[in-house]
């Protein structure tokens, strides 16, 4: 699995999770076979403003690489500035969060709220890509706002055309949040719609879940979130 020029070694990625994805968690995931981990989501504005909380979140050690940083933002100036600042720390990938459905995030037009405005999303992605150099930019998406407003094919294409190296697709809508069963069939459609790698995400709790998602949808990689909580064995058992 490659993101731009970055070879992850395998298809297993650990999702950025608030209050979870700290250094000990990431190191354990790596020891059990994860190819790429992420720091928790961090505000682009917080990085620009040198807020201690934001800077502390994305601190990582060299032995954690490859490692990614996920940014939260809706402003091209803040996002491009944050990407330039992050280059000092040499992350291996930078993700734009367009998938968080939590109300305290979406009410400020962050996260999954951006799904309603693909034009703005494209501008945000391009602003990051233009200053990222060799660092691949990925985009975390959901299927759309609701079952009646699914626009994942449009947003995935916008991400590709704006220069993203991959899209990460959580197979639920914003309104569904983490309820109901994920809709993996959309991953097949996204794979047919874009040329960049597609990373599947949503209800991967066992090695069998990982295996089935890859086999049924042909995604290039998977991102495991809640399934890795207290269960790093999901990575080693899948690989074995």
Segments (PLM) and residue ranges:
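Flavin-dependent oxidoreductase catalytic cores
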Residues: 1-240
